[in-house]
């Protein structure tokens, strides 16, 4: 069973995409708001009935119902409002995530946890520490969403098929993210061979800023994060051994320890099966290190 804690727009879309991909026979939507997960589940099930997809989506307000879950996605918390940064949400969401993870420990202690709540990297750290799970079983969704946005900008700039584009974004899921043109390509051709430096810099900045633009225009980002969640879940349940940037706990990798930050990792049935260390240049290291310090600084004022 896949459990998604938080039944708002992103949680609902994550359940929808996961059901359409048939990632499990049972998907549970959990939320403290009476009626919300039940109504969301009903709506999705009606769609699945027309599609002929035999996945059962259930809504509940009882944490005990997550017993037996293989994967728990944590989306619970307050979302960004126009003008807010992800870090503005830290104090609001830290206590919510801690409470949720305590319940995951109690009722689904064999599961993997995928934190999604913003600010993502600090929340992934809190999840890892509070759960006490092995680091392979706690990995946050951040870079997967960022690279989908980076891919879209590459598609718009080159005109090439989205399917031919491979992109990579690491670091903080926030203002200090690190889109990596050197490690991105179109049909195997390195991106710097296709676009001038000025254009690459423009794509990087657009990738960093586009979420705020979407929030300004429609109030929230919904479909892209919902799909990114399902893509990570799919890598686990299908044992894809797929290289995905996830927020995972570092213990010496990239010369950093005791921090959770976005890095490329092999994701399969055992969760984070291997962390891949890239040969970053000095400029890239500077941005990555700044992201690490930002996450550590944010957590310094949080009691775990």
From Swiss-Prot:
The active site is at residue 173. Gene3D superfamilies: Lactate dehydrogenase/glycoside hydrolase, family 4, C-terminal, NAD(P)-binding Rossmann-like Domain. It is an enzyme of class 1 (oxidoreductase). Its EC number is 1.1.1.37. GO terms for molecular function: L-lactate dehydrogenase activity; L-malate dehydrogenase (NAD+) activity. The keyword NAD applies. Pfam families: Ldh_1_C, Ldh_1_N. It catalyses: (S)-malate + NAD(+) = oxaloacetate + NADH + H(+). The keyword Oxidoreductase applies. NAD(+) binds at residues 6-11, 31, 93, 116-118. Belongs to the LDH/MDH superfamily. Catalyzes the reversible oxidation of malate to oxaloacetate. NCBIfam families: PRK06223.1. This is Malate dehydrogenase. The lineage of its organism: Archaea, Nitrososphaerota, Nitrososphaeria, Nitrosopumilales, Nitrosopumilaceae. The gene is mdh.
